[in-house]
Amino acid sequence: MKTLELTGAALNWAVAQCEGKNSVASCYYEDNVPLWLDEAPHPVWEPSSNWAQGGAIIEREGISLYLYSDSEWNSHLGGKEYCATTPLIAAMRCYVASKLGDEVEVPEELLDCVYE
């Protein structure tokens, strides 16, 4: 899957791979909301929507972010540039691309587990 198209559980999984979190998982639904967990009962890993998780990566990696237009954020890291509707999604796509490349093999079960 193209890194540019990663969202939700697939993007969070790819970030986990970059972070060395190898115990992947699963997608399950709670109150009709798809969630991806590292291993229960740990907190949900959502760096593409959780500033405490994604913000730490942005700061550590030195990912640059700026508002490109009213509805688009751009991110830069190591010669990679990615955009998205939120700064966290843009930054996490950029991070994944810098570590794993412009295409990522995502487990099939995570492809239907999309949220943004």
Regions found by a protein language model. Name each.
Residues M1-E116:
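Glycine-rich anion-binding surface patch
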